[in-house]
């Protein structure tokens, strides 16, 4: 039986002042459909010192890229499982829990500037 490799691409924000996207890919032949917590060296992403560099990637959302490739969005945890300082999702969860009885909504906004020919700049 010829099995395709399954690619699980874990994506997270690093610890730089202006965060960058980072990723690493796990290739598996047998997959149970779950996205396990995975570790990475946080010293290379400004998320841990060199002498204690293990950080954890906690999957929070996944998207199918193709029939055998998944994008796995992650939040960063410290090696003890607590939220890392760069983990803005944890801050948002805390804020949301303070207002759980309120009716609120939030969203993202992206602005564009159009040239005279109707093409976005950049």
Regions found by a protein language model. Name each.
Residues 1-122:
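Glycine-rich, acidic/polar active-site loops that bind/position phosphate-bearing ligands
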């Amino acid at each position: 039986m010829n099995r395709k490799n399954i690619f699980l691409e874990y994506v997270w924000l690093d610890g730089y002042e202006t965060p960058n996207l980072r990723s690493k890919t796990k290739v598996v032949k047998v997959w149970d459909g779950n996205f396990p917590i995975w570790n990475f060296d946080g010293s290379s992403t400004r998320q841990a010192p060199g002498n204690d560099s293990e950080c954890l990637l906690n999957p929070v959302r996944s998207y199918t890229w193709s029939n055998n490739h998944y994008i796995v969005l992650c939040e960063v945890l410290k090696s003890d499982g607590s939220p890392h300082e760069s983990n803005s999702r944890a801050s948002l969860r805390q804020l949301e829990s303070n207002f759980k009885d309120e009716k609120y909504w939030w969203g993202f906004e992206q602005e564009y500037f159009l040239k005279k020919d109707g093409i976005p700049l950049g």
